[in-house]
Amino acid sequence: ITSCGLNQGPLRAEGSYPSVIACNLTNGNMPHGSNSIFQISFPNVTHQGEERFLAEISEGTLIGYKYFSFRNVTRIGVMARIETEDNKVQYKGPLRLDERVTEKADRHHQIRRPGMPSEQPVLEIRLTETGDPVGEILLDENAEEWTKFWGNAEIPDGESALYFVYHGTPRIQLRDICF
């Protein structure tokens, strides 16, 4: 699965894209998808009305996009906000619980990502899942409304995947990625 889908090639790293085109979204410890409603928190694609975004992004979450065509890109931005009880999407339908909800975490997919938790929320910018960061985007832990944040990045020209790894205590939501 790629983010560029029917584009016949990599997306141009210009303008902005909805965050929900991510082709990788994991905290390294997630249940496999099903039509059940899970009562555990994990990164997910969701919506409020017509607005689509990634939610429940917590420490160590990996968000990946394949592929972009980079040309003279020196900074990357995101439209993000801190997840609060007021903006968190609450499921209001009937529960269809899956017995896997209560399985131990070590039975789910695990990936190793180097990095240290951060007191200030930060998104590392990477070109590979486990590679060294090429930049970072510092977020404001008080931003409860959609806010655009930018970070400098050293990205060589050419085609590449783009990954973000989140470090921080509060959960965040991500609406757009920007170039």
Regions found by a protein language model. Give the residues of each.
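Extracytoplasmic
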Residues: 1-179
